[in-house]
C-alpha cells in the first residue's frame, strides 16, 4: 500500500441488540378464523366458484351482535357521548363542507418510530383479543382454566337421560305426524288429479311435466338421448363401436298433451323415420330345389302379403303407439334391413356357390339339391303378434350371430406378454416372429368368416341332423330283433354325435346279464357329411346320402348278430359247446355286397353250420357234413344245404339258434 491511500475500516456494531432491531421491527400477529373456502356453485363447464371466508373483523362483529351489552355494562350506565359540545359539531360540519382535510404527517421520533408503530398495532390486536375472550367467557362460550384446575367430566344422571329420551320421542312423534300429514295431502291430490276434478291448469301442467321427465329418464336407461338446442332427439343405431347419431337413424322426442280419453298413452311422443315405420322379420329356411317346390321358392309378384310400405294415412296410428314399441320395432327393422343387405353382398362374393336375389328373397346353394332361403318380410306398424315363419332354430342362430358380431371388438389393444418357458437354446428362444415364415403364419392364422358362411355350415349341419334323426327313427321302428335304441351324446352347431344301442331280450335267459352283450355304434355328423363309427373304431363315410346311412346302420346290426351267434355257441350252459371255425365280418357275397358270416362245428365234429347275414335281409343258414379229410371227401356228400330261416323254431334269432344247436349237438 502506498502512503497517500486512505484505509477504510469496517464499522462494527456496538452491540447485537441494535442489529436485531434493524432486522425485526415489531411482532406481527395474525388473528383470523381457520375456515375453508366454501363452494358457492359449480358451473356446467366444471368451474367451481367459492365464497370468500370471513376475516377476523367480520367474525368479531358477528359475535358482537350476539352479546347482550346491557347485561355486561348495566342499564344505569350513562352514555359517554351523550354530552357533546355543539361547537364541536359545527367544527366537524365545517370541515366536512369546507373541503378535504390535509394529510397529517407523522413527526419523526428518531430511529425507534417504526418500532413504536408496530408495537402499538400489536397492542391493539391484543386488546381486541382480550375483549373477545372476556365476552366469550362471560357468556359461557368458553371458560378458561388454569393448569392446576382439575378437569372433571360430568356424567349424565338417569333423570337427564330419561328427559333427553322423552324429548327425542316427542320430536320424533311430531316429525312422523308431519310426514303423515304430507303423505295424506299428496294422496288426496293424486286422487283428485286422477279424476281431474277441481285442479288448476298449472297443477295439471306440473303433473304432465313431472311425468314427462320420469319417462324421459326411463328412456335414457335403454336408448341414447341428447338435447340439441330446444330439440330432444335419440339414436336408433345398434352399433356398439363406431359412429353414433347417424341422420337416417335419429328419432325426435316431444311431449303430447293428454286428455281424459288418452290415459293409457305415454306422455312422450316419438317420430321415427318413415322408412323404418314398419315391422320386419327375416325368415331362414332350407328348401329343396325340385319341381314341387319350384313355384314357392320366390314370392308371387301379385301377392302383397309381405310388401308393406309406409303410407301417410297411417301417421296418426303411428303417433298413438307407445314409444317402447315404436323404438323397438323401428330398430329391429333397421337391423334386419342392414343384415339382409350384408348377406346379399357376401353371397355375391362367394365363387363356389350359386345365389339368386329377387323381391327381398335370397336363394343360395347349400348342398346337392337343397337351397338356403332368406326372406325379408314387412308388416304394418301396429300392435299384434306376428307369426314366425321359416326354421325357428335357424332364425334364432342368425339373431345370435348378429348380436355376437356387433359385440365383438375386432381391434385388440396392445399389451405386454411374457415369453414362454422352454428348454430350447437361447438363439431359438428369442426368435419371436421369426420362428415361422410367412406361409406358416398365414396357414395357422385364424381368419374371420362372414355371417353367411357360418350360416351355411349351421344350415348344412341342421339338414344332416334332421336326416340322421329320420334314419334312426326308421331303424328303431323296423328292427325288432335286435332292438335298436338311439340317443344324442352331444349336439352342437356344426358337430353332433348320436349313439345307437342294440340289445336282445333273449340274451338274459342264456347269458344272464344284458350289459355284457350290449353293443353300440355311433353316427358322427358334421357340416360336410355323416360317418358311422363302430365300437371297434371302424368308420364308414356316408357323405350326405340317407340310403348309405341306413345301409351302414344295418351293417352294424349284422355284425352284432355275428357276435350274438358266437357268444351263444360258447355258452357254458351247453354240455358240449360248439366250436367257432371261422368268423368274418368283412366277408362279401357273390354280388360283392357286405355279408358277415360265421361257421360253427359241433363237439362231435359231424356237422358244420354256416350263418350268413345279408344287409337288410333275413339271415341264411346252411348245414353240411363236417369235412375230415379234404383229399378223400366227395363233393356230393358235403354240399351245403340251405335251411328255411322262417321255419326254424322260435320267434327271435336267439331262440332259432338255440333250437338249431340243440338239434345238431349230437348228430
From Swiss-Prot:
Q: Which gene encodes it?
A: mdt-17
Major localization class = nucleus
The entry describes its oligomerization and partners as:
Component of the Mediator complex.
Q: Does the keyword Cell division apply?
A: no
Q: Which residues cross the membrane?
A: none
Provide the alphabetized UniProt keywords.
Answer: Activator, Coiled coil, Developmental protein, Nucleus, Transcription, Transcription regulation
Q: Which residues form a coiled coil?
A: 172-197
Q: Which InterPro entries match?
A: Mediator_Med17
Indicate where this protein resides in the cell: Nucleus
Q: Which family does it belong to?
A: Belongs to the Mediator complex subunit 17 family.
Question: What organism is listed for this UniProt entry?
Answer: Caenorhabditis elegans
- The molecule here is called Mediator of RNA polymerase II transcription subunit 17
Functionally, this protein is described as follows: Component of the Mediator complex, a coactivator involved in regulated gene transcription of nearly all RNA polymerase II-dependent genes. Mediator functions as a bridge to convey information from gene-specific regulatory proteins to the basal RNA polymerase II transcription machinery. Mediator is recruited to promoters by direct interactions with regulatory proteins and serves as a scaffold for the assembly of a functional preinitiation complex with RNA polymerase II and the general transcription factors.
GO-annotated molecular function: transcription coregulator activity
Any GO BP annotation: regulation of transcription by RNA polymerase II
An example of a Gene Ontology cellular component annotation for this protein is: mediator complex
Amino acid at each position: 500500500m502506498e502512503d497517500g491511500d486512505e484505509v477504510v475500516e469496517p464499522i462494527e456494531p456496538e452491540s447485537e441488540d441494535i442489529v436485531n432491531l434493524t432486522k425485526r421491527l415489531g411482532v406481527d400477529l395474525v388473528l383470523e378464523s381457520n375456515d375453508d373456502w366454501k363452494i358457492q356453485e359449480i358451473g356446467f363447464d366444471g368451474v367451481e366458484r367459492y365464497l370468500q371466508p370471513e376475516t377476523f373483523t367480520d367474525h368479531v362483529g358477528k359475535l358482537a351482535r350476539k352479546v347482550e351489552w346491557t347485561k355486561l355494562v348495566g342499564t344505569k350506565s350513562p352514555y359517554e357521548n351523550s354530552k357533546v359540545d355543539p361547537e364541536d359539531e359545527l367544527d366537524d360540519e365545517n370541515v366536512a363542507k369546507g373541503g378535504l382535510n390535509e394529510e397529517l404527517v407523522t413527526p419523526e421520533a428518531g430511529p425507534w418510530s417504526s418500532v413504536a408503530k408496530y408495537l402499538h398495532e400489536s397492542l391493539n390486536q391484543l386488546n381486541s383479543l382480550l375483549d373477545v375472550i372476556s365476552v366469550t367467557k362471560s357468556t359461557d362460550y368458553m371458560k378458561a382454566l388454569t393448569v392446576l384446575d382439575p378437569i372433571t367430566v360430568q356424567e349424565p344422571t338417569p333423570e337427564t337421560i330419561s328427559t333427553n329420551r322423552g324429548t327425542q320421542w316427542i320430536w320424533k312423534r311430531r316429525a312422523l305426524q308431519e310426514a303423515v300429514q304430507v303423505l295424506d295431502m299428496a294422496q288426496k291430490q293424486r286422487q283428485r288429479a286422477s279424476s281431474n276434478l277441481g285442479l288448476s291448469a298449472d297443477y295439471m301442467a306440473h303433473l304432465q311435466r313431472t311425468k314427462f321427465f320420469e319417462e324421459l329418464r326411463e328412456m335414457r336407461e335403454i336408448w341414447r338421448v341428447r338435447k340439441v338446442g330446444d330439440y330432444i332427439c335419440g339414436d336408433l343405431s345398434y352399433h356398439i363401436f363406431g359412429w353414433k347419431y347417424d341422420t337416417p337413424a335419429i328419432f325426435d322426442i316431444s311431449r303430447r298433451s293428454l286428455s281424459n280419453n288418452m290415459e293409457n298413452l305415454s306422455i312422450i311422443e316419438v317420430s321415427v323415420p318413415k322408412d323404418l315405420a314398419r315391422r320386419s322379420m327375416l325368415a331362414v329356411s332350407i328348401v329343396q330345389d325340385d319341381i314341387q317346390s319350384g313355384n314357392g321358392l320366390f314370392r308371387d309378384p301379385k301377392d302383397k302379403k309381405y310388401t308393406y310400405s309406409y303410407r301417410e294415412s297411417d301417421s296418426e296410428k303411428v303417433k298413438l303407439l307407445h314409444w317402447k314399441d315404436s323404438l323397438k320395432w323401428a330398430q329391429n327393422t333397421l337391423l334386419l334391413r342392414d343384415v339382409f343387405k350384408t348377406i346379399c353382398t357376401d353371397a355375391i362374393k362367394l365363387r363356389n356357390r350359386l345365389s339368386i336375389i329377387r323381391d327381398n328373397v335370397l336363394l343360395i346353394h347349400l348342398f346337392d339339391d337343397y337351397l338356403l332361403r332368406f326372406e325379408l318380410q314387412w308388416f304394418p306398424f301396429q300392435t299384434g303378434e306376428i307369426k314366425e315363419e321359416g326354421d325357428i332354430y335357424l332364425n334364432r342362430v342368425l339373431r345370435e350371430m348378429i348380436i355376437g358380431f356387433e359385440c365383438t371388438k375386432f381391434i385388440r389393444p396392445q399389451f405386454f406378454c411374457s415369453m414362454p418357458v422352454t428348454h430350447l437354446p437361447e438363439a431359438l428362444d428369442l426368435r419371436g416372429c421369426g420362428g415361422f415364415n410367412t406361409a406358416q403364419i398365414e396357414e395357422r392364422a385364424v381368419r374371420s368368416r362372414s355371417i353367411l358362411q357360418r350360416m351355411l355350415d349351421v344350415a348344412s349341419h341342421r339338414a344332416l341332423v334332421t336326416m340322421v334323426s329320420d334314419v334312426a327313427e326308421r331303424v328303431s321302428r323296423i328292427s325288432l330283433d335286435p332292438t335298436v335304441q338311439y340317443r344324442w351324446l352331444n349336439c352342437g352347431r356344426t358337430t353332433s354325435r348320436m349313439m345307437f344301442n342294440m340289445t336282445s331280450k333273449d340274451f338274459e335267459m342264456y347269458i344272464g346279464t344284458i350289459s355284457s352283450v350290449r353293443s353300440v355304434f355311433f353316427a358322427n355328423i358334421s357340416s360336410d357329411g355323416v360317418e358311422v363309427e363302430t365300437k371297434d373304431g371302424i368308420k364308414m363315410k356316408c357323405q350326405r346320402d340317407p340310403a348309405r346311412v341306413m345301409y351302414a346302420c344295418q351293417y352294424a346290426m349284422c355284425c352284432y348278430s355275428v357276435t350274438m351267434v358266437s357268444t351263444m355257441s360258447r355258452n357254458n350252459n351247453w354240455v358240449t359247446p360248439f366250436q367257432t371255425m371261422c368268423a368274418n365280418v368283412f366277408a362279401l357275397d357273390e354280388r360283392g355286397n357286405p355279408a358277415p358270416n360265421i361257421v360253427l362245428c359241433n363237439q362231435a365234429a359231424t356237422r358244420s353250420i354256416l350263418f350268413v347275414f345279408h344287409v337288410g335281409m333275413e339271415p341264411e343258414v346252411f348245414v353240411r357234413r363236417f369235412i375230415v379229410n379234404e383229399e378223400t371227401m366227395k363233393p356230393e356228400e358235403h354240399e351245403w344245404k340251405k335251411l328255411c330261416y322262417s321255419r326254424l323254431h322260435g320267434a327271435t334269432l336267439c331262440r332259432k339258434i338255440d333250437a338249431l344247436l340243440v338239434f345238431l349237438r349230437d348228430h
